[in-house]
Amino acid sequence: MSDSHLTAFDKASKAGFIIALGIVYGDIGTSPLYTMQSLVENQGGVNQVSESFILGSISLIIWTLTLITTIKYVLIALKADNHHEGGIFSLFTLVRKMSPWLIIPAMIGGATLLSDGALTPAVTVTSAIEGLKAVPGLSHIYQNQTNVIITTLVILIVLFGIQRFGTGFIGKIFGPVMFIWFSFLGVSGFFNTLGHLEIFKAINPYYALHLLFSPENHRGIFILGSIFLATTGAEALYSDLGHVGRGNIYVSWPFVKVCIVLSYCGQAAWILANKHSGIELNPFFASVPSQLRVYLVSLATLAAIIASQALISGSFTLVSEAMRLKIFPLFRVTYPGANLGQLYIPVINWILFAVTSCTVLYFRTSAHMEAAYGLAITITMLMTTILLNYYLIKEGVKPFLAHLVMTFFALVEFIFFWASAVKFMHGGYVVVILALAIVFVMFIWHAGTRIVFKYVKSLNLNDYKEQIKQLRDDVCFDLYQTNVVYLSNRMQDYMIDRSILYSILDKRPKRARVYWFVNVQVTDEPYTAKYKVDMMGTDYMVRVNLYLGFRMPQTVPRYLRTIVQDLMESGRLPKQEQEYTITPGRDVGDFRFVLIEERVSNARQLSNFERFIMQTKASIKHVTASPMRWFGLQYSEVTLEVVPLILSDVLKLPIKELVPVEDSEA
């Protein structure tokens, strides 16, 4: 990696500062909409809170943001970039060679992050729309929660509906809108605190610790389940590292944190001033003058939409990375924007929409959604901590020190997990079930791939080079295609899947002028695009290793076109002049891609568990994208061949001949 790239990545700019506000901080920036409301409602309402309770709550929020978001994510996790990319799968690719079991925390963390992403739009948009209950002239309409639900669903329909067109055209306003949002949080919060400056005593962690063990705290340690809502967006901050660069996050986070903390302090000051008023509105909206509330609701709705958009885009990226790491089924991916970073996965988009909409309809109010919110993300953070521990050791930190630091964060996060676990019976089971379903799919896909590698036999290409040459020159067979391309899952030291040679020589001899054996390897770097060619001492057999980053599309024909041109220009591959063509000077022949799918037959070698894995994976494949579409072959000539997973299983089965009995012997 060049020094200039590192400098650009670590450099901050005014434009980068604004962009970071629109991309990185949507989730954590909308937390003030519902965090204080959750704390107050769980304590029994505004009338039931005391000054010490409020001071302790604000102190817990401040120190949670400091320990988890600032220290763990901003100061430690942002250092763990994989060629400028962040997130749990990028972190996993950095450390996966250290231990094979690290795939487990990576899958669990990715699954819980996805399930959390399905709930975030429901919580944020509903919370924003519920602010209309505090707007004079509209409150009588939105006191009816059904109207809140209808408005929320309309916004969600529009939000998920525009994903297919790309969001670049509206993405340009995200940064400025969020700058206005955070500025409003800071300014309004500051003015609300002017009458109660004692609220700033909450900076002292004594008040946080005192509240945890105070009899005034009706929920005990379980209050941390509500406190954690303030920092749920910390994981997204790390995941979006590649979009804005480390330098811009370093510069923008202090501004964001100050504005968020001032907002919480301002709400706390309003509660202290109005705890005997009998007002039971969301402190976030109630703390603003009534004539400004309609503008605040509009701004909050925009901020909620931006936060939701960031989670949706993040989910697409997360699934895309998981597919390329071969731990998730293949789904069709499109790129509606001008760059590879703007991707769209239709199936995931509509699954997210269905889950989000059902969440709104099932829980109805943001208060009920908050009861379920945050449980999954505590698990994601714990999994990230495990991977960070290995990363620190890999980077040369002494194991004892790495274990000490990460054990501290793991302990803090486990306490938050334990405090949030009470949410399971209050709706948290929804995200847990969703996360378990995603983990199950990931496990099946990963385990199925390992089983295939275990049982599919390999043969040495060199041993069959002469046979392939004879077939190439044998005019008794019609020319199958000028170029025949086989995609191989593994190709090392001239070893290749037996099923490929079976297809060329046994199933139906395929005569061609050139045989291509292509293997796509996903690299730990995100944007690699390299290849290696071995002609095997011939001009008719070509081994191609494609090295593509885990964020690169695997459109094989486009890369192969470039490789063919390079080989012909260098003289390693003879030109294939075409007698009949509408393209003058065309010197590349026709191509046919042969895809081989291994299916489970009555394979006696498979255990019952392995057979269950393979049959389940086959069932999942029915609703996923075909390899043809995944490798960009939909506009190419393709042959799909099905072979048994274990070829030897069909070659010879024991069977006994029944000898007919002569009538005379009867």
From Swiss-Prot:
UniProt source species: Streptococcus pyogenes serotype M6 (strain ATCC BAA-946 / MGAS10394)
Compartmental location: Cell membrane
MF (Gene Ontology): potassium ion transmembrane transporter activity; symporter activity
Alphabetic keyword roster: Cell membrane, Ion transport, Membrane, Potassium, Potassium transport, Symport, Transmembrane, Transmembrane helix, Transport
InterPro entries noted in UniProt: K+_transporter (IPR003855), K_trans_C (IPR053952), K_trans_N (IPR053951), Kup (IPR023051)
Protein name: Probable potassium transport system protein Kup
Gene Ontology CC terms, in alphabetical order: plasma membrane
Function: Transport of potassium into the cell. Likely operates as a K(+):H(+) symporter.
Membrane topology: Multi-pass membrane protein
Reaction it catalyzes: K(+)(in) + H(+)(in) = K(+)(out) + H(+)(out)
Chain segments annotated as transmembrane: 16-36, 58-78, 100-120, 141-161, 165-185, 221-241, 253-273, 294-314, 343-363, 373-393, 399-419, 424-444
